[in-house]
Amino acid sequence: MDIEERINLVLKKPTEEVLTVENLRHLFEIGAPLQHYIGFEISGYIHLGTGLMAGAKIADFQKAGIKTRVFLADWHSWINDKLGGDLEVIQEVALKYFKVGMEKSIEVMGGDPKKVEFVLASEILEKGDYWQTVIDISKNVTLSRVMRSITIMGRQMGEAIDFAKLIYPMMQVADIFYQGVTIAHAGMDQRKAHVIAIEVAQKLRYHPIVHEGEKLKPVAVHHHLLLGLQEPPKWPIESEEEFKEIKAQMKMSKSKPYSAVFIHDSPEEIRQKLRKAFCPAREVRYNPVLDWVEYIIFREEPTEFTVHRPAKFGGDVTYTTFEELKRDFAEGKLHPLDLKNAVAEYLINLLEPIRRYFEKHPEPLELMRSVKITR
């Protein structure tokens, strides 16, 4: 596989942004060690926006010959008040539920979970020189920049927060350098931390990423955030500015169960959630069901996706590209209910191996039902 083919795998859906493609090409060309990482807070159940979007990209990175790592951010979750802010509970959930759920998600998206290294944050944070790296980074970042970066925790600028939360962005940047990560991966909502990492990379004294004497900047790969299924707070959306603002607010959320499908959901739960989903006829600009079709079903094109309909409504129709389906929907040739039903059946089939695993091994879900899920 040549360099351009490897770059195309990194750029493949659901990737929305690579900072920068030129730097990625440079890392391939000089033969730098390619170490990927994606970090997760440990909170509630894993939904498709976490499991499938991250799992899909991990599969792509593996195909491109990049070492993959999932970072279980227990301390970060504690700082951000997840699972009642109980560090021991967070660690138990990380190892007994989250790790297993991500392994299964990676597998259904075509990756090899056995080739993914899972690292608990506390394994490295308890080493003294980690904090040296945090301070080194902090000396190169202004307080106002840190304040603007708290949105990576799902917090609003201006929100009353405890001081520990100001340390969080610097820890997230330190995680990259301390682990020798050359490819930092996350959803688009983590962009601010990754931009800081790129900007400070060549200023660091402790744990810079060095290859043959060259201080390297990490590459940041940001995947699409799946939209939640709920109706936006304002509809219709009139201006482009409103559209961007609402789209950023309406990502899938585990705290809004009907906005999300979870990886262990039963067939009936999936059908029910899709049936209630916001999916206005002919609306292709803001439509969560179409969003899922584009980034889950048509991640690879061409692919065959069949919508089953009674003969009196036109009979079955098979699409091979997202644009074909989108055009039919915009023209009113594809009814929202038919699309919802087809997406539900696709997801039921895709998630079947995960569902079967948790039916045979109920302990992780029993653990989740016993803990206090906050935020």
Swiss-Prot record:
CDD domains with a match to the protein in the record: TyrRS_core
Pfam families associated with the record: tRNA-synt_1b
Keywords: Aminoacyl-tRNA synthetase, ATP-binding, Cytoplasm, Ligase, Nucleotide-binding, Protein biosynthesis
EC number: 6.1.1.1
UniProt-annotated binding residues for ATP: 254
BP terms from Gene Ontology: tyrosyl-tRNA aminoacylation
Reaction catalyzed: tRNA(Tyr) + L-tyrosine + ATP = L-tyrosyl-tRNA(Tyr) + AMP + diphosphate + H(+)
Subcellular location: Cytoplasm
Keyword Cytoplasm: yes
Sequence motif: 'KMSKS' region, positions: 251-255
PANTHER family referenced in this protein's UniProt entry, alphabetically: TYROSINE--TRNA LIGASE, CYTOPLASMIC (PTHR46264:SF4), TYROSINE-TRNA LIGASE (PTHR46264)
Assembly behavior: Homodimer.
Reported function: Catalyzes the attachment of tyrosine to tRNA(Tyr) in a two-step reaction: tyrosine is first activated by ATP to form Tyr-AMP and then transferred to the acceptor end of tRNA(Tyr).
Protein name per the record: Tyrosine--tRNA ligase
Native source species: Pyrococcus horikoshii (strain ATCC 700860 / DSM 12428 / JCM 9974 / NBRC 100139 / OT-3)
Gene name as annotated: tyrS
